[in-house]
Every structure is written in C-alpha cells, then in structure tokens.
Amino acid sequence: MNRLDYSGVKPDWQDAIASFFASQTGRVLADFIKTREDAGAIIYPPRPFRALELTALAETRVIIVGQDPYHGPGQAQGLSFHVPAECKIPPSLRNIHKELQRDLGIARPSTGELTGWARQGVLLLNAVLTVEDGKAASHAKKGWEALTDSLLRLVAQDSSPKVFMLWGAYAQSKEPLIGQHHLILKCNHPSPLSATKPPVPFIGCGHFSRANVWLKQQGLEEIHWEKFTDSEPIQNSFLF
C-alpha cells in the first residue's frame, strides 16, 4: 500500500497536492515517511487524505481545523475528530457531542463517526496528516503543515462564503490564511483541559447554530449536524 497515494481525492484538490509533492518540502516528507515505514514504525491513518476524498473543494461550506491524528490503534481515519464506529469516543469528541446537544438539542450519538458531516461539505482537516503509534505529534513539522496551509489558502480564496471553526490556539494560528469574506468562529479546544475555561469556553460557544444561521443568510444550505453518518436520519433541532 502506498500511504501517500492521493488518486482517490476529489479532482479539485489534486493539483495542489501534486504541486506539494513535486516540491522540496514534499519530497522530504515522502522520504521521511518511507524511512519510518522501512524502520518498522506503525503509522496512522491508512488513508491520510480521507477528508479530501469525501469533501470536494467546490462543496466545502464549513472547515473544522484539527491538529494531528489520533495516535491509538484503529482511531485515526483521516478526518479531524472522527473515529470509526467500533472505537470508544474520545473526550474531545464527547464534548463536541455535548455542545451539539446544548446548542441544537441534538441527541448524543453512540458513535464517533463524522462522515455524514464530511459528505455535506464539512472539511475535517488536520494540519498534520500522519502520526506514529503512541507518539502524539510525531510527524509534526515534517512538511505536512506546508500542504495543509496551502489547502486552507485554496479554500479561503474560493469565492463562495465559508465558515471556519478554529478551536484552540493551534487552529487559531491559521487565521491569517483566511480571507475577510468568510465567517471565522473561535473558541477554546473541546479537550476537557480547556472546554469549560476562559477565554472562550467551547461548551457554550454555539458555533453549530451560528454557522447555520450565517450559511442561510448567505443563501447556502445549512448543515444537518445531527447526520453523523451517511445512513443517519435527519432529526428536528431547536434551530428554526
């Protein structure tokens, strides 16, 4: 398996990815990952570009910026905050579910899946797309950030208005990449370490309802936040 095979991503991302891997930074990153694999390192996720496979640039309406993948077995799937159905829901994602319930009256799901969001135009993009087993941030500052920054710029340069959700200081460091005609929502990271603390607690931020109000004002379709998976029925919520 070629972990860096991006042939499955949506066509409107492919030129940016090809340009990156043709660059010196991209070649260094590819060499680093191959060297680590050859040394026996266990690297997650198996499909680093999954977010770009599920959400086309042209269909992106909301961007949720993550930092790097989960580093436990079977967790990371190439989508920020998402875990597959068989995995225990991580604490940050539990707080996302908690805020959805508080904000929109959405019942907390039994799954940590977010593919239903991705297929509606929510780009779940981590800044770093690979990690080694048990070693958080082990592939940070190896080159991924140059690619994902370029993707964020590409999204921001698109003429269609978008919502950027920047949770925590790291995600907020990406704000200079974003243009003024988009809605930027900022608060603390949903981690239990910061979700209820100043300056802007995640619990109580109201980002999900605020995003939908703004999208509707722009003449765009709202996100059905209760649709966590492809098969999930749409629930009624408190947003009118």
Please identify what each model-predicted range represents.
Residues 3-17:
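Generic N-terminal amphipathic, Lys/Arg-enriched alpha-helix
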